[in-house]
């Protein structure tokens, strides 16, 4: 196999060669995946069913849950299947689709997190005009811009990557198809399209980071002017988790895409990939919704209705 037209499949790296640990990995990833899917589906359904959860903040949370659901479904099930079936292969077309989805979904998540920071700025710094500032039309426009931007960049990344010539080796140093891992297999010296794609991606991520930082500078300035300690504490508790999520997501993504490549995968490389592809979809529902009174109230209402309907049938 000398180029990508003859490359029929790729081999994904295993977390371990030990048979017992491989099954343990499959079990752990299965639990993580089922937990993430269940939590994100519940959040989406609650926000659709309860009219109180139709504000801008919940609009973004609903779409974030949808993105998280898609992102973890793009990578984890294949890793679980390979561990259970004791195989490492992924088809060429499967790799193309997986790469496109990861770039699209991860990038769109950055856009949503940026929009959420602006929504928090509007809620804290302009509380009387929040609904006017974060109108339904603006929310839809921000969402569409994020999807279109990352969709175009995803196509550019995917087309640029698979237009390159590959070595005879088809072993990826990653548990899913990702640009850095694929570039290690290429024998092409010129990566012009990829270089342009990375530059655009870095500019996009940096501009999102700047918007988030500026929003939080205004937010923390406004919070520090609040006289009541209880209200200050509540505002900080709502904002700090979001800031932590953004920081971890951007830092791990930057490390994965910008650090120099190595000849063999390290456990650190795999952990970094887990942090930006598996951890966010699992942790976001907990971070954003566990202490949210409106969501807890909506869940209690749904459970009560289900229980009441069951009693009535009896």
Swiss-Prot record:
Annotated gene: OR14K1
Ranges of the Extracellular topological domain: 1-23, 74-97, 153-194, 257-269
Species, as recorded: Homo sapiens
Assigned protein family: Belongs to the G-protein coupled receptor 1 family.
TM stretches of this protein: 24-44, 53-73, 98-118, 132-152, 195-215, 236-256, 270-290
Membrane topology, from the record: Multi-pass membrane protein
Subcellular location: Cell membrane
Key words, A-Z: Cell membrane, Disulfide bond, G-protein coupled receptor, Glycoprotein, Membrane, Olfaction, Receptor, Sensory transduction, Transducer, Transmembrane, Transmembrane helix
Function description: Odorant receptor.
Residues glycosylated per entry: 3
Protein name: Olfactory receptor 14K1
One GO MF term: G protein-coupled receptor activity
PANTHER family tied to this protein: OLFACTORY RECEPTOR
């Amino acid at each position: 196999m000398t180029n990508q037209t003859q490359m029929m499949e790729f081999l994904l790296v295993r977390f371990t060669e030990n048979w017992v640990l491989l099954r343990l990995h499959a079990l752990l990833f299965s639990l993580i995946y089922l937990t993430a899917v269940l939590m994100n589906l519940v959040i989406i359904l609650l926000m659709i069913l309860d009219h109180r959860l139709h504000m801008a903040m919940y609009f973004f949370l609903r779409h974030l849950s949808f993105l998280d659901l898609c992102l973890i479904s793009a990578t984890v099930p294949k890793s679980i299947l390979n561990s259970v079936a004791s195989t490492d292969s992924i088809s060429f077309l499967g790799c193309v689709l997986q790469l496109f989805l990861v770039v699209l979904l991860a990038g769109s998540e950055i856009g949503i997190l940026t929009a959420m920071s602006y929504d928090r700025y509007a809620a804290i710094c302009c509380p009387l005009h929040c609904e006017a500032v974060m109108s339904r039309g603006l929310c839809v426009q921000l969402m569409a811009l994020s999807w279109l931007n990352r969709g175009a960049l995803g196509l550019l990344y995917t087309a640029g990557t698979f237009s390159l010539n590959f070595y005879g080796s088809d072993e990826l140093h990653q548990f899913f198809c990702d640009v850095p891992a694929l570039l290690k297999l290429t024998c092409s010296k010129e990566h012009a399209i990829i270089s342009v794609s990375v530059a655009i991606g870095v500019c996009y991520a940096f501009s999102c980071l700047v918007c988030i930082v500026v929003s939080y500078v205004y937010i923390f300035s406004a919070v520090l002017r609040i006289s009541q300690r209880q209200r200050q504490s509540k505002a900080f508790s709502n904002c700090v988790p979001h800031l932590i999520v953004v920081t971890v997501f951007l830092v791990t993504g930057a490390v994965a895409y910008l650090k120099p490549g190595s000849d063999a995968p390290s456990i650190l490389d795999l952990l970094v990939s887990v942090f930006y592809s598996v951890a966010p979809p699992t942790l976001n529902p907990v971070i954003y919704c566990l202490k949210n009174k409106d969501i807890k109230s909506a869940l209690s209402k749904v459970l009560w209705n289900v229980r009441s309907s069951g009693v009535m049938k009896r």
